[in-house]
């Protein structure tokens, strides 16, 4: 058999399908786009769902890709099994309404067995099919000529792909026989037929024949358009072609494992031979190496795609991977942060197909290092907690084990091993049940979100062509109505209702790429319609949601008028988004990556990833860079070209969270901003007019949202509003100060107020006045305390001559009832009296117009016999409500 590297395997796969007229889809981000049902891209087909359900038209009915994916539903198995990973790469070929079973099987067989490609021995391949899928069985037997003893007809459990609702169908799987050396019990093909986990017969390819729609109640209807969805794990192929015991000895992971060995000062070694001659201690060591090698790869890719360690969702998964790796690193004697030193190894092995990782190296290293160092402190607390549990209990409970697992990153194996050293047991079964409940809660939180949309016949058949003309115009006469529908029903005529309309040509922009949809009107002699919304259809038609007054019919000619003012201000903001993206990358570095945006006529916001919150000075610098480009009056340039040309020739920023067509549109401003974009933009930067950053907020670990405004009108309105808010706050502070300045004067507070009052309204002074106001609040906080202390002191002056008298127990006691003291005053008076007299009990009551207050205090010297809380609770003649301790009790009272 050929010995192939991972890069060679991937290339042979993609080149083969490209030669068979498949369109190559670039790998996309691990972060799903417009799919709340998924936390991660978890398969090769997950990125293609809109093509399969008909919401979008694919660039070709034949597709191929190599897609990175993450699955973490059983993360605890990583490092234990031979082929389980958090991140994996799935090779795929897909047919959307083109070829079906026969050609899919023939293509797979040719790639696997032809000497020009993988050249695998045909006799080493075994096949499974769904037991009711006679068609697939006969293709393998009669067309491919597979021996019948190499074909297994299995149940729905293993050979029918169904997620409960939407496209589904039978599948066929291809297995490679690695030989008897991997089958120590000599079970043979029954390992396949009985679906027994094994290392002899490796599943290399799964081909799903998507031919039914499940309505959600297990009623199956033939799809109007049948599809092929296949997946083949690259890591498994690598293990086969490199003849390794597990995936971890392949060129994907083994260089990282060798690097970890160096970081242990070679005190610990990974043993390949341990597979055949297992040793419990070495198996545990191997597991540690595997976990680290697997988790660091997933972490590098996730952070590069914009996921940062955090406390929820994707961020929590990455935090958990880092923490789990740290724990296993400690098992290998590594006590310092070390994972960040492995980033280079991961990038080196993956950069040929993922060159963008190179630019992310510094960001990824710094992010991992920061997270490691924070966790190492937590980890030591985890060890302390476990040691305390072991000292005080005979068993580590299920709840304690889960706490150690989730909050401190302790794998259950780690807890068991440490506990066993002290002959303490762990409630493993209880832990597993609690862990499953936690997982189920996560699943339930997402279960109502459909994993696959039911294939919509209306959209799959929606082939009418429509041209968007709005890049160069905002009005059009004699546009033709070519399609109308309502409630998923096609209509020919509509009167005084809302309807969805497609025109042959339209100037109305459909919401996409972060830009809001246009609004406006359409009209002719028979009707007037208000365009409420515009969304894009599966083949790029702009679908207008229109409230019709009068009657509108298919084939009518209408006049279109876009709301020009809304469009103009939206254009300013969209171009402003490109400007601030450029400026942030210029100020903070190219590790800044846009992860979403929205712009309409009212402003813009942009989400971006970065390892920390930018400083005010950095934001001001970015703002000034944008203003400089506006002042320089730079023309916009627009190009239509291939994705490859857009990057190579125009240095356009292409975002891995987006999917692009074969021909893309590049928007350039000078030599500083070049992005793929389908939106509307100003012709010259001067048309943006003005620019200001109005705020920034964290949207999660490593993700920030910046908000901005453009145009003279919007910026001036914002400045006037903000200055009024700040000056009103300053006015409120000084008004309160003026009420008390006869009691205590503060020149600093008065001076700051005058500076705020006299500050001129402009962008440069916005930060100045904000800082002055913050300074004023700090000074006022200190001033208020001093004034309140003075007021209290003055109120307490008339009680300075209080003296104790002996109570019935011959103990010094001061009892006072008054009407002018609040609870704070009473506590201060009690402290003053205890400081003045020794061995004293103080009982103070005050009845104001609004409330009653009581404070009881006891000198420390008496607290062995008299406790403030006891006196408080048993005060003769009063019902008290409150709390306290031996020293002091406080609350409210009612006379009996």
UniProtKB/Swiss-Prot annotation:
Catalytic activity: tRNA(Ala) + L-alanine + ATP = L-alanyl-tRNA(Ala) + AMP + diphosphate
Coarse class of the protein's main subcellular location: cytoplasm
The gene coding this protein: alaS
GO biological process, one term: alanyl-tRNA aminoacylation
UniProt note: domains: Consists of three domains; the N-terminal catalytic domain, the editing domain and the C-terminal C-Ala domain. The editing domain removes incorrectly charged amino acids, while the C-Ala domain, along with tRNA(Ala), serves as a bridge to cooperatively bring together the editing and aminoacylation centers thus stimulating deacylation of misacylated tRNAs.
A Pfam family hit: DHHA1
Enzyme class: ligase
Family: Belongs to the class-II aminoacyl-tRNA synthetase family.
Molecular functions per Gene Ontology: alanine-tRNA ligase activity; aminoacyl-tRNA deacylase activity; ATP binding; tRNA binding; zinc ion binding
Function of the protein: Catalyzes the attachment of alanine to tRNA(Ala) in a two-step reaction: alanine is first activated by ATP to form Ala-AMP and then transferred to the acceptor end of tRNA(Ala). Also edits incorrectly charged Ser-tRNA(Ala) and Gly-tRNA(Ala) via its editing domain.
A GO cellular component annotation in the UniProt record: cytosol
Location within or outside the cell: Cytoplasm
Residues that bind Zn(2+): 574, 578, 677, 681
Keyword Membrane: no
Entry EC no(s): 6.1.1.7
Cofactor-binding details, from the entry: Binds 1 zinc ion per subunit.
Domain of life: Bacteria
Cofactor: Zn(2+)
Protein's name according to its UniProt entry: Alanine--tRNA ligase
Alphabetically ordered keywords of this record: Aminoacyl-tRNA synthetase, ATP-binding, Cytoplasm, Ligase, Metal-binding, Nucleotide-binding, Protein biosynthesis, RNA-binding, tRNA-binding, Zinc
Organism: Mycoplasma mycoides subsp. mycoides SC (strain CCUG 32753 / NCTC 10114 / PG1)
């Amino acid at each position: 058999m050929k010995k192939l590297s991972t890069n060679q395997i991937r290339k042979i796969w993609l080149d083969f399908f490209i030669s068979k007229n498949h369109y190559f889809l670039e790998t996309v981000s691990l972060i799903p786009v417009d799919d709340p049902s998924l936390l991660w891209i978890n398969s090769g087909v997950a990125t293609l769902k809109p093509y399969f359900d008909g919401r979008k038209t694919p660039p070709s009915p034949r597709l191929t890709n190599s897609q990175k994916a993450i699955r973490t539903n059983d993360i605890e198995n990583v490092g234990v099994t031979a082929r389980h990973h958090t991140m994996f790469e799935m090779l795929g070929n897909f047919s959307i309404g083109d070829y079906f079973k026969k050609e899919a099987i023939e293509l797979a067989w040719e790639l696997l067995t032809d000497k020009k490609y993988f050249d695998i021995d045909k006799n080493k391949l075994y096949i499974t099919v769904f037991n009711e899928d006679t068609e697939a069985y006969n293709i393998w037997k009669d067309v491919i000529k597979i021996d019948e003893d190499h074909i297994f007809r299995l149940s729905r459990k293993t050979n029918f792909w169904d997620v409960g609702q939407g496209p589904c169908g039978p599948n066929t799987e291809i297995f490679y026989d690695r030989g008897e050396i991997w089958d120590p019990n000599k079970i043979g093909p029954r390992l396949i037929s009985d679906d027994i986990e094994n290392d002899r017969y490796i599943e290399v390819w799964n081909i799903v024949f998507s031919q039914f729609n499940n309505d959600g109640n297990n009623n199956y209807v033939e799809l109007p358009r049948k599809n092929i969805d296949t997946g083949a794990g690259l890591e498994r192929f690598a293990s086969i072609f490199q003849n390794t015991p597990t995936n971890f000895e392949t060129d994907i992971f083994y260089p990282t494992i060798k690097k970890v060995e160096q970081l242990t000062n070679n005190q610990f070694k990974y043993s390949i031979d341990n597979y055949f001659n297992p040793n419990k201690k070495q198996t545990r060591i191997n597991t540690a190496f595997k976990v680290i090698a697997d988790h660091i790869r997933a972490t590098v890719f996730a952070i590069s795609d914009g996921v940062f360690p955090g406390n929820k969702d994707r961020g929590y998964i990455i935090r958990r991977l880092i923490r789990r790796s740290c724990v296993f690193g400690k098992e290998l004697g590594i006590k310092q942060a070390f994972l960040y030193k492995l980033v280079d190894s991961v990038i080196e092995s993956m950069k040929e197909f993922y060159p963008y990782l190179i630019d992310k190296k510094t960001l990824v290293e710094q992010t991992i290092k920061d997270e490691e160092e924070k966790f190492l402190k937590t980890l030591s607390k985890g060890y302390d907690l476990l040691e305390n549990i072991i000292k005080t209990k005979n068993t580590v409970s299920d709840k304690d084990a889960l706490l150690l697992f989730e909050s401190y990153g302790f794998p259950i194996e780690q807890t068991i091993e440490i506990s066993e050293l002290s002959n303490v047991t762990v409630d493993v079964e209880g832990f597993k049940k609690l862990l499953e409940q936690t997982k189920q809660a996560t699943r339930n939180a997402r279960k109502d979100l459909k994993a696959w949309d039911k294939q919509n016949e209306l959209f799959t058949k929606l082939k009418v062509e429509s041209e968007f003309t709005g890049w160069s115009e905002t009005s059009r006469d004699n546009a033709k109505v070519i399609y109308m529908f309502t409630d998923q029903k096609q209509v020919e005529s509509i009167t005084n209702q809302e309807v969805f309309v497609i025109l042959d040509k339209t100037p109305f922009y459909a919401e996409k790429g972060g830009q809001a949809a246009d609004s406006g009107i359409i009209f002719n002699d028979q009707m007037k319609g208000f365009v409420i919304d515009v969304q894009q259809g599966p083949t790029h038609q702009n679908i207008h949601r229109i409230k019709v007054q009068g009657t509108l019919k298919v084939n009518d000619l209408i006049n279109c008028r876009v709301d020009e003012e809304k469009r103009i201000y939206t254009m300013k903001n969209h171009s402003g988004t490109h400007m601030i993206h450029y400026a942030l990358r210029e100020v903070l570095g190219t590790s800044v990556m846009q992860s979403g945006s929205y712009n309409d006529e009212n402003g813009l916001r942009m989400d971006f990833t970065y390892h920390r919150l930018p400083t005010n000075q950095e934001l001001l610098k970015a703002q000034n860079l944008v203003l400089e480009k506006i002042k320089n009056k730079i023309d916009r340039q627009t190009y239509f070209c291939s994705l490859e040309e857009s990057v190579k020739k125009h240095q356009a920023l292409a975002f891995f969270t987006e999917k692009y067509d074969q021909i893309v549109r590049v928007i350039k401003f000078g030599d500083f901003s070049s992005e793929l974009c389908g939106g509307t933009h100003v012709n010259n930067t001067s048309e943006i007019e003005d620019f200001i950053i109005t705020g920034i907020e964290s949207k999660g670990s490593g993700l920030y949202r910046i908000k901005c405004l453009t145009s003279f009108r919007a910026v001036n309105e914002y400045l006037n509003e903000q200055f009024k808010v700040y000056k009103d706050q300053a006015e409120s502070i000084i008004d309160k100060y003026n009420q008390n300045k006869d009691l205590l004067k503060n020149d600093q507070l008065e001076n700051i107020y005058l500076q705020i009052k006299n500050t001129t309204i402009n962008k440069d002074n916005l930060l100045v006045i904000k800082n002055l106001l913050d300074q004023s609040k700090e000074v006022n906080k200190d001033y208020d305390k001093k004034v309140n202390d003075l007021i209290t002191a003055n109120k307490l002056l008339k009680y300075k001559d209080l003296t104790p008298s002996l109570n019935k127990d011959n103990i010094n006691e001061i009892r006072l009832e008054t009407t002018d003291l609040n609870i704070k005053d009473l506590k201060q008076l009690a402290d003053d009296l205890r400081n003045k007299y020794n061995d004293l009990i103080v009982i103070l009551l005050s009845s104001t117009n609004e409330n009653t207050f009581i404070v009881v205090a006891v000198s420390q010297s008496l607290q062995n016999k008299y406790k403030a809380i006891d006196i408080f609770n048993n005060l003769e003649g009063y019902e008290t409500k409150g709390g306290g301790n031996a020293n002091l009790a406080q609350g409210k009272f009612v006379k009996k």
